[in-house]
Amino acid sequence: MPAYRSRTTTHGRNMAGARGLWRATGMKDSDFGKPIIAVVNSFTQFVPGHVHLKDLGQLVAREIEAAGGVAKEFNTIAVDDGIAMGHDGMLYSLPSRELIADSVEYMVNAHCADAMVCISNCDKITPGMLMASLRLNIPTVFVSGGPMEAGKVVLHGKTHALDLVDAMVAAADEKISDEDVQTIERSACPTCGSCSGMFTANSMNCLTEALGLSLPGNGSTLATHADRKRLFVEAGHLIVDLARRYYEQDDIKALPRTIASKQAFENAMALDIAMGGSTNTVLHILAAAHEGEIDFTMADIDALSRRVPCLSKVAPAKSDVHMEDVHRAGGIMSILGELDKGGLLNRNCPTVHAETLGDAIDRWDITRTTSETVRNFYRAAPGGIPTQVAFSQEARWDELDTDRQNGVIRSVEHPFSRDGGLAVLKGNLAVDGCIVKTAGVDESILKFSGPARVFESQDASVKAILANEVKAGDVVVIRYEGPKGGPGMQEMLYPTSYLKSKGLGKACALITDGRFSGGTSGLSIGHASPEAANGGTIGLVREGDMIDIDIPNRTISLRVDEAELAARRADQDAKGWHPAEVRKRNVTTALKAYAAFATSADRGAVRDLNAR
């Protein structure tokens, strides 16, 4: 039977000093011997997805103590990618994932916590905590802050559903008046919560359901809705039960590495492909698998992308559909239910809340459940009142969306497309692969060829796009923006948004060794591996080179013969693999430390001590 980790600091005469310190935090004699549960919060006033989390850690803590555990809360950092976007702040976003994982490890191991509840929400916080949970392999439950309500605005007599990306696109569109831009800006983000579309934050919170590490509804229940409180209350009780199962009954099914097995990662990736999740999820899933020593690679993602159809399209792929609409259609359990009906899911994976994922789907899929409680849960609707307060409204939809032929969630027989929402492309331009969110690509440009417009930075590309120097038919290439070359692998949301604002969203392609925001749509191909700084072919592209993209056949090619490429490579080796133009970029010691050990995106941009 495994011993409680916390007894290292709470038992024995030689731990008198440690017990004295524990007592100073409020512990009593009766607490020594109870499981010590770390409540890993990520409250910050910088991020709308986290601004409402301040009191929720203590809500969970009270439930832990009511269930017989001892709760100890600490905080991690949290970067808002939207606020950090478009300037040097974005260099810090992806590296913050590693810092979050490390900080959780440091706190939990330094104080010998037995288990943890991870209160996450936005882009790098859920992945960082997920990496930590698999690294530590102690009982863990995830409960996120929940998605924001979609914005609503009336412009020129028409009602529009809005999100953050709409504000960015409008601001760059010279045809839209200052007054309308301001109206859109003020309406785009009306409440607390993670941005309202199927962007990175919501994608990752949905994937925790498929991995079996969070409760049903974690990915789709609105931050403002009273129903979300139940997830936090249940998480507090559940984690104590999981801790006791592992430490007192030697039940390894309470551990993250048993729950989030390779089969569970396949489920999560199948969900990601079916719902057209953010391309960033590929990075984070690969990184989490690495931490859990799970053999899950780009090859597995490629194989899944060839057989899993696209069953849901949410903003940015479908601008009038947001997470509140996904929830009304049954949320993640109903998407998993459709995959299950199509034989595309591993039903026997354990979860933190049910014996198997299959059992959970049978109870929580609104098309098969007999529970009115479950059906009422998925009727939770937006309140339509701007607020930063969690659980502040109780609105309900009159009816659920159970239309699997034309609704927000489709059946395998009636998909949005037979090909899934994400695809891995390979070719001489990306030998180790690159990623495209096919759910956001117009069918007319699934095959695309054009001349390269080469930029050594995101900033240079933005300047050219806004100056109308990029034309229809061009392939914009942005390089030296990978994990090492950036450093930090910036998101390219501004270039893609500005292409859209110029009417080029369906007329151009963009290829980068950087990455994209979950808010990106269009023919946007990221994570080109190896990255330019690691000698990738993207570093050899020259202005005007023809590039061929074939999504149906999963290829991406630079139309340059091998002899010419070899000559260019020899020339670049002599010069060194760095941008041809000097970039005004403040690369601090912290960023240099990340760059020194960062791998390319095909490995999840994780650190490798042998990378140097």
UniProtKB/Swiss-Prot annotation:
| Gene Ontology BP, a term | isoleucine biosynthetic process
Stated name of the protein = Dihydroxy-acid dehydratase
Keyword terms: 2Fe-2S, Amino-acid biosynthesis, Branched-chain amino acid biosynthesis, Iron, Iron-sulfur, Lyase, Magnesium, Metal-binding
Sites binding Mg(2+) sit at D81, D123, K124, E491
Could you say which protein family the record assigns here? Belongs to the IlvD/Edd family.
Please list the reactions this protein catalyses: (2R)-2,3-dihydroxy-3-methylbutanoate = 3-methyl-2-oxobutanoate + H2O; (2R,3R)-2,3-dihydroxy-3-methylpentanoate = (S)-3-methyl-2-oxopentanoate + H2O
User: Which species is listed as the source?
Assistant: Rhizobium leguminosarum bv. trifolii (strain WSM2304)
Binding of [2Fe-2S] cluster occurs at C122, C195
Q: What class of enzyme is it?
A: lyase
Pathway of action: Amino-acid biosynthesis; L-isoleucine biosynthesis; L-isoleucine from 2-oxobutanoate: step 3/4; Amino-acid biosynthesis; L-valine biosynthesis; L-valine from pyruvate: step 3/4
Which EC number(s) are documented for this chain?
A: 4.2.1.9
Q: Which Pfam families match?
A: ILV_EDD_C (PF24877), ILVD_EDD_N (PF00920)
Q: Known HAMAP family for this protein?
A: IlvD (MF_00012)
Entry-annotated residues carrying N6-carboxylysine: K124
| Cofactor comment | Binds 1 [2Fe-2S] cluster per subunit. This cluster acts as a Lewis acid cofactor.
Instruction: Output the InterPro entries linked to this UniProt entry.
Output: Dihydro-acid_dehy_C, DihydroxyA_deHydtase, DiOHA_6PGluconate_deHydtase_CS, ILV_EDD_C, ILV_EDD_N, IlvD/EDD_N
Q: Name one GO cellular component term.
A: cytosol
Cofactor(s) the protein requires to work:
[2Fe-2S] cluster; Mg(2+)
Assembly and oligomerization? Homodimer.
Q: Where are the transmembrane segments?
A: none
| Domain of life where this protein originates | Bacteria
Q: Does the keyword Membrane apply?
A: no
Summarizing the function annotation, the protein's role is: Functions in the biosynthesis of branched-chain amino acids. Catalyzes the dehydration of (2R,3R)-2,3-dihydroxy-3-methylpentanoate (2,3-dihydroxy-3-methylvalerate) into 2-oxo-3-methylpentanoate (2-oxo-3-methylvalerate) and of (2R)-2,3-dihydroxy-3-methylbutanoate (2,3-dihydroxyisovalerate) into 2-oxo-3-methylbutanoate (2-oxoisovalerate), the penultimate precursor to L-isoleucine and L-valine, respectively.
GO MF annotation list: 2 iron, 2 sulfur cluster binding; dihydroxy-acid dehydratase activity; magnesium ion binding
- Where are the catalytic residues? S517 (proton acceptor)
